[in-house]
C-alpha cells in the first residue's frame, strides 16, 4: 500500500498537476445513459458528426448532384419510366420538360432523403389559373407528389378561376395545402427543399405513416405532414407497401417547366436510431452499445493505480455498465484513492483542489441518476469533507 500511495503522489504532482479543462479527466459530465439512451448528456464518447462542406450557392459536399446544367448529368442520372433515355432536354443549362413525353425518373433509387430543386413557371403561364399554369411535381419514390404550379395569388379577391387548395404549389397533392402560399410570380425562379421520410411497415401493416417537410422559397410550408395515402387525382388511395428505395420522379403534366440545380442527400430514417431515442430505441440495442462503450473505457484504466484519473474513469464506466468486474475495480480504486487523500497535508490537499471537486461531482452524477447509493463508497464522504474545508479557506 505504501508503494501504491507513493505512486499516486508522483502521478498527482506530475501527470495531474496541470489545471483540468472543462472536461479534463472527469468523464462524468452530464446525466447518465438510461434504457432508451446509450449516451449521457454531453457525452464525449458519442460519435462526432461528419463534417460536410457547405459552400455558398452550391450543393453540400455529401449531396448527389442530379442536374448541374450539363447533358452529362442528364445522361448519368435520368431516364424515362421504362429505363430508356429521357426525352426531356437541356436548354440554356436548364432541364426542361418535354410536354407529353412522360415523367423523368432518377436512375438511382432513393428512400428517405433531402431533395433540393429550383423551378420556374413559364412566363407565358402568368395568366393561367387552376391546374393549367406550369404544372409539374416532385414525386418522392414515384408515389407521393409535391405539386409544382403557377400559384402566385397576390389578390385573393380577384375574379379568377381559383384552384383547389390541396392542389396549389407546395401542397402534398390531394392531401394537404401549404401552410402559406409562398409562391413567386411566373417567370421568377423558385426553390423547394424537401425532407422526406417514407412510411414504415411491418407484417403488412403501417407502423409509421411517413412524413414530408417542405420549404418553399425558404418558407416552411409543410411541417412534417404525415402521409395519408398516395398522390392521386380526385380519389383517395391508401398507403401501399413498396420497396424501401425507388426512383424519384419529376412530373410531365404537359407544360415545358424548366428545372435547375437538382441534388439529393440520402438521410437515415428517424426510426433507424435504435440506440438513443425516446421514440425508436430498442432496449437490447441500447444495452449492447452501453456495454461496448464501458468495455472500451475500462481498457484505458490502470486498476492498480488508484489516482484521480483512474477513479473518475471507473465512475464513468459504471454510468454505462455495472458488471461485477467493474464494481470490484471501483471498490479497489476508490479505497486506494481515499487512503491517499487522507494521507495528504493541508498544502497537498489544496494542490489537489480541482480533482477533489471534480471527482465529487462525478459521484453526485451517479447518485442523482440512481446508479449508486450515497453511501456505497466511503471515498465520497472524504471528498465532501475535504471540499468543504477547501471552500471555507477561500
Predicted segments, located by residue:
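Carbohydrate-interacting regions of secretory-pathway proteins
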Residues: 19-394
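N-terminal signal peptide c-region/cleavage motif recognized by signal peptidases
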Residues: 14-15
Amino acid at each position: 500500500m505504501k508503494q501504491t500511495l507513493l505512486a499516486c503522489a508522483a502521478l498527482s504532482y506530475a501527470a495531474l498537476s496541470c489545471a483540468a479543462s472543462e472536461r479534463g479527466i472527469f468523464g462524468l459530465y452530464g446525466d447518465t445513459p438510461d434504457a432508451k439512451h446509450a449516451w449521457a448528456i454531453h457525452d464525449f464518447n458519442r460519435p462526432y458528426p461528419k463534417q460536410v462542406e457547405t459552400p455558398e450557392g452550391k450543393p453540400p459536399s455529401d449531396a448527389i448532384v442530379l442536374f448541374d446544367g450539363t447533358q452529362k448529368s442528364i445522361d448519368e442520372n435520368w431516364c424515362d419510366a421504362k429505363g430508356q433515355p429521357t426525352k426531356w432536354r437541356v436548354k440554356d443549362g436548364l432541364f426542361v420538360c418535354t410536354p407529353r413525353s412522360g415523367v423523368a425518373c432518377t436512375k438511382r433509387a432513393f428512400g428517405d432523403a433531402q431533395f433540393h430543386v429550383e423551378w420556374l413557371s413559364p412566363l407565358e403561364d402568368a395568366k393561367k389559373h387552376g391546374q393549367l399554369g406550369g404544372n409539374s411535381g416532385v414525386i418522392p419514390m414515384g408515389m407521393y407528389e409535391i405539386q409544382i404550379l403557377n400559384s402566385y395569388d397576390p389578390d385573393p379577391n380577384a375574379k379568377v378561376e381559383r384552384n383547389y387548395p390541396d392542389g396549389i404549389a407546395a401542397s402534398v397533392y390531394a392531401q394537404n395545402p401549404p401552410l402559406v402560399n409562398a409562391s413567386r410570380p411566373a417567370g421568377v425562379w423558385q426553390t423547394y427543399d424537401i425532407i422526406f421520410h417514407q412510411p414504415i411497415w411491418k407484417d403488412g401493416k403501417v407502423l409509421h405513416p411517413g412524413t414530408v417537410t417542405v420549404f418553399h422559397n425558404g418558407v416552411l410550408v409543410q411541417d412534417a405532414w404525415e402521409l395519408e395515402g398516395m398522390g392521386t387525382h380526385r380519389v383517395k388511395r391508401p398507403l401501399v407497401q413498396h420497396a424501401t428505395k425507388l426512383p424519384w420522379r419529376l412530373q410531365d403534366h404537359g407544360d415545358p417547366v424548366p428545372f435547375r440545380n437538382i441534388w439529393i442527400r440520402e438521410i437515415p430514417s428517424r426510426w433507424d436510431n435504435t440506440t438513443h431515442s425516446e421514440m425508436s430505441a430498442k432496449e437490447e440495442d441500447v444495452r449492447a452499445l452501453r456495454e461496448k462503450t464501458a468495455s472500451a473505457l475500462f481498457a484505458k484504466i490502470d486498476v492498480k493505480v488508484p489516482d484521480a484519473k483512474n477513479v473518475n474513469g471507473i465512475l464513468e464506466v459504471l454510468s454505462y455498465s455495472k458488471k461485477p468486474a467493474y464494481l470490484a475495480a471501483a471498490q479497489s480504486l476508490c479505497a486506494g484513492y481515499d487512503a491517499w487523500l487522507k494521507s495528504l497535508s493541508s498544502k497537498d490537499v489544496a494542490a489537489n483542489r480541482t480533482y477533489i471537486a471534480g471527482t465529487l461531482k462525478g459521484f453526485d452524477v451517479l447518485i442523482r441518476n440512481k446508479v449508486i447509493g450515497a453511501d456505497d463508497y466511503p471515498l465520497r464522504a472524504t471528498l465532501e469533507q475535504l471540499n468543504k474545508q477547501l471552500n471555507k479557506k477561500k
